[in-house]
């Protein structure tokens, strides 16, 4: 029996790499049903101020094809509490590179108050979509 019934994680999943796969695998190891929110192009433009290399519809298909993923939903907002109200997960998974940030401290308190655990998973060192993009651009 896994620790959580429904888990949730989110990401852009642009230029899909081993770090993305590791987060999805580690999350699935802890929950029976893993829901993954894939950030829409509009959301990425709003908070990262750049357009993903891979279009949203293709990123959705890539994530849906991963065996650790049970369900994929569009992430149209950074509001994790609103996502909980819609999806009713009992754990939310994030890379530990977010741990301690003001935004995540606040949302962790709100989610804990309704019985949701925020689980930080070890970030895969040395790999990121930003670094891959820089290499492709010759930086």
Range-by-range predicted roles:
Residues 1-139:
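Nucleotidyltransferase catalytic core that binds NTPs
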